Amino acid sequence: MTFEEAMNRLNEIVERLERGNVGLEESLALFEEGLKLHRFCSEKLKELELKLVEVQEDEAGEVTFEEIVEMEDDLPF
């Protein structure tokens, strides 16, 4: 599953739960699936952040975090 697929499914789950027209058991199942998707997306973002840090490391081994901080402000969650 890609990050985008996981985010789309997570958005679908949130919409269904917000509508409130699902039973208790289905709500619990959707909530559990949503938690798993959230963990998956968080891990993918952490992996991306590590790659960005590696890319931004200069010749002296210094790492600049400016770009990462700016990117975090634009995240949709």
Swiss-Prot record:
Pfam families to which the protein is assigned, alphabetical: Exonuc_VII_S
Catalytic activity from the UniProt record: Exonucleolytic cleavage in either 5'- to 3'- or 3'- to 5'-direction to yield nucleoside 5'-phosphates
GO CC field: cytosol; exodeoxyribonuclease VII complex
EC number in record: 3.1.11.6
SUPFAM superfamilies membership: XseB-like
GO biological process: DNA catabolic process
Gene3D superfamilies in UniProt: Exonuclease VII, small subunit (1.10.287.1040)
Superkingdom per UniProt: Bacteria
Keywords: Cytoplasm, Exonuclease, Hydrolase, Nuclease
Keyword Hydrolase in record: yes
Protein function: Bidirectionally degrades single-stranded DNA into large acid-insoluble oligonucleotides, which are then degraded further into small acid-soluble oligonucleotides.
Entry's family note: Belongs to the XseB family.
Quaternary organization: Heterooligomer composed of large and small subunits.
Official protein name in the record: Exodeoxyribonuclease 7 small subunit
Species for this entry: Carboxydothermus hydrogenoformans (strain ATCC BAA-161 / DSM 6008 / Z-2901)
Taxonomic lineage from the root: Bacteria, Bacillati, Bacillota, Clostridia, Thermoanaerobacterales
